[in-house]
Amino acid sequence: MKVCITHREIFYHLLHAVFQACEKKPVIAELGVLRGENALKLYNALAPEKMVLIDSWSPAANDAYSPFDPLPAWVEPVDSYAYYYGGPMDDPATWDALYQECLSKFVEMDNVTAIRADTISAIEQIQPITGIDKFDLVYIDANHQYEYILRDLMYYQDLVADDGFILLNDCCHSHLGTKQNLGVLEALSSFLKRSDFIPLAVTNTDWSDVILVRKNSIMVKLVDMALTNSDIPFVEIPHQLISAAKVIRGQQRVNISFA
């Protein structure tokens, strides 16, 4: 696994080059879309044949933030992040506004479909609405709590083509992540034991992104070649160390430690 000193957007362009080498226009999906900002970056970088955006855009998403009442002392209340969402977290109008903001970004893209549903309910809608059976890339950025992210990984692996990718957002342990009750890294650690996916690369950043692919896929070699021949600095470590990843914050920048 390559620990790359870069940002997630560079990964998108790297994978675009890999898809181009395979003469493929990828079919892609994003789970957890919010305003559509990252989805638009994915679209512009990957030039997909089709794209599916899946999000409930619903205050019901708050229900899974934590099973405990009162919250543990180390977890901040979900309402603490209302500023990021543009309004009260329990107000449907906040989510309706986010949904409309997202749609406005893709109004001229007729190959983009938005499905307003939670990630699991959306599965049975994908094929009837879009005709898509398999994705070449699924970006997972929906509910970040352990049980939910593990469920998304377990279900959506079956919708990923044999040589397809899963990209996972916010996959690190950090002080800020703990405040949000993130369980992404822990879910990935469990998923790797239950599947044939392996991590190929991770960004050396807070809120790290990870590229996953099946261990016997040709994409293991192609991504390795693409990174090795790029100008992206990296160090390589055994992928089994991914579960030890934690953010170390210094005065100048953050780094990922596996010690």
Regions found by a protein language model. Give the residues of each.
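N-terminal pre-P-loop "Q-motif" helix
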Residues: 7-11
